[in-house]
């Protein structure tokens, strides 16, 4: 679940900023 949460958070940031966060 921790990994899923991290991915979801990163995906949200990427969508919000409109840039790839990696």
Curated annotation (Swiss-Prot):
Q: What's a GO cellular component annotated to this UniProt protein?
A: extracellular region
Molecular function as annotated in GO: pectinesterase activity
Q: Which GO terms describe its biological process?
A: cell wall organization; pectin catabolic process
Q: Site Transition state stabilizer: give positions.
A: 5
Q: Where does substrate bind?
A: 19, 21
Active site (record annotation): 6
Question: What is the protein name given in its UniProt record?
Answer: Pectinesterase
């Amino acid at each position: 679940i921790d990994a899923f949460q991290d991915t979801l958070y990163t995906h949200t940031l990427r969508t919000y900023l409109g840039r790839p966060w990696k």
